[in-house]
């Protein structure tokens, strides 16, 4: 399995959110997508998920351009809840089951209960930590080749953070491509074997963790790259 981007770009209102990005990931890769807010991480994930289209270049999964056919092979945990106000945690599972044939509703409800999510509770009443558990439970209940997690531990408490990391870690050896977007490097470094560093929409460093660290902590590499940028 290969996920390949070539000269990938995306513009919004004439400004590049992502510019001339090139990379290749293979099955079994657990890749950290690193950078401060506004670096292009979410835009890249939305391109991979087929939620937005490239302004230039290409992105392919096993040689197929990202689009309707590949959407069924990509699971995406976004940063926000996007459900209707009236929907319950149980309703979210029904919603996913209607859209994704690979969604295991029974596994989702089991995972949600283990996460102490109220199946009949309205999503709009969930705390930020519970919202993160909901989005992760939905994504992990799909049998997708590519699984993406956008800022999965941002703004959550320590207990929720540990639960999220454990749930993602359980997929490490599944042969899938896992892509984890974050700026909280230290907490997720142990999950990954590769890293992509984005800055102002451009890929500034990429490779295996051993290559990019060169014997240092990944957090030190992050500071070296982004130390002069606001918001780091």
Question: Where do the language-model regions lie?
Answer:
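Conserved ABC transporter NBD signature motif
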Residues: 56-70
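Catalytic Walker B motif of ABC-type/P-loop ATPase nucleotide-binding domains
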Residues: 147-151, 156
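ABC ATPase "signature
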Residues: 206-207
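The feature captures the beta-strand-to-loop junction immediately N-terminal to the Walker
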Residues: 34-36
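ABC-family P-loop ATPase nucleotide-binding domains
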Residues: 80-134
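Helix-to-loop junction immediately C-terminal to a conserved catalytic motif
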Residues: 49
């Amino acid at each position: 399995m290969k996920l390949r981007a070539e000269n990938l770009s995306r513009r919004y209102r004439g400004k590049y959110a992502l510019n001339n990005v090139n990379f290749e990931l293979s099955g079994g890769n657990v890749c950290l997508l690193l950078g401060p807010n506004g670096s292009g991480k979410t835009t890249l994930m939305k391109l991979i998920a087929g939620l937005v289209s490239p302004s230039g270049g290409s992105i392919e999964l096993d040689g197929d351009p990202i689009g309707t056919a590949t959407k069924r092979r990509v699971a995406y945990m976004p940063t926000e809840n996007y459900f209707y106000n009236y929907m319950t945690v149980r309703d979210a599972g029904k919603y996913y089951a209607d859209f994704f044939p690979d969604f295991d509703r029974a596994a989702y409800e089991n995972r949600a209960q283990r996460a102490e999510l109220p199946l009949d509770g309205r999503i709009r009443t969930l705390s930020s930590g519970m919202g993160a558990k909901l989005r992760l439970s939905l994504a992990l209940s799909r049998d997708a080749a590519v699984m993406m997690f956008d800022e999965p531990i941002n703004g959550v408490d320590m207990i929720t953070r540990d639960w999220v990391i454990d749930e993602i870690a359980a997929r490490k050896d599944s042969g899938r491509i896992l892509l984890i977007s974050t700026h909280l490097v230290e907490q997720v470094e142990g999950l990954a074997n590769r890293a992509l560093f984005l800055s102002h929409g451009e890929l500034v460093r990429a490779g295996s963790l051993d290559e990019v660290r060169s014997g240092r902590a990944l957090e030190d590499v992050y500071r070296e790259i982004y130390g002069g940028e606001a918001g780091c």
